[in-house]
């Protein structure tokens, strides 16, 4: 093997090592969740949400129009979504705490009624958990969730306007700051 080949192999090895280090560092530091503040006056998806009547985890029909006039935090989730499950205890605490007096937290499950009911029975969620099945993905897309990623959370003011959307696991410090502006 001559020196030119040896130098080329060494350069390739260094490039592979650098690539591996870069990938390894990004796995430890995942990208932050995406949040968006829609332009003022965005109400069309909220009107579509209020037109929905979805069954809860026990199969009881729940018209979402009953929440009109109240600030809402709508969380699109699924039982198989790890980050969704991780944020649920904090959402439950939020719903049953001081913030819950001013804000209606709602979970919209994107899965079968059976899976949602089993999950709800196991984890004892303190806020309404509704079943949308796969149509929940389309509903979340109306709020700007183009890829249908989960969890996806929408903060809606009492005025019926979308205040902010969050894609990925919620950062509750950021959420509490946003709630203070309602």
At which residue positions do the language-model features occur?
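N-terminal targeting signals for export/organelle localization
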Residues: 1-51
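A short beta-strand-turn-helix
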Residues: 46, 51-72, 140-143
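Conserved redox-active cysteine motifs that mediate thiol-disulfide chemistry
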Residues: 68, 76-93
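Active-site acidic short loop of glycosyltransferases
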Residues: 68-70, 100, 126, 148
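Short pre-active-site segment immediately N-terminal to redox-active cysteine/selenocysteine motifs
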Residues: 70-72, 76-80, 112, 149
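Structural microenvironment flanking redox-active thiols in thiol-disulfide oxidoreductases
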Residues: 85-124, 134-141
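Thiol/disulfide oxidoreductase modules built on the thioredoxin-like
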Residues: 121-126, 132-180
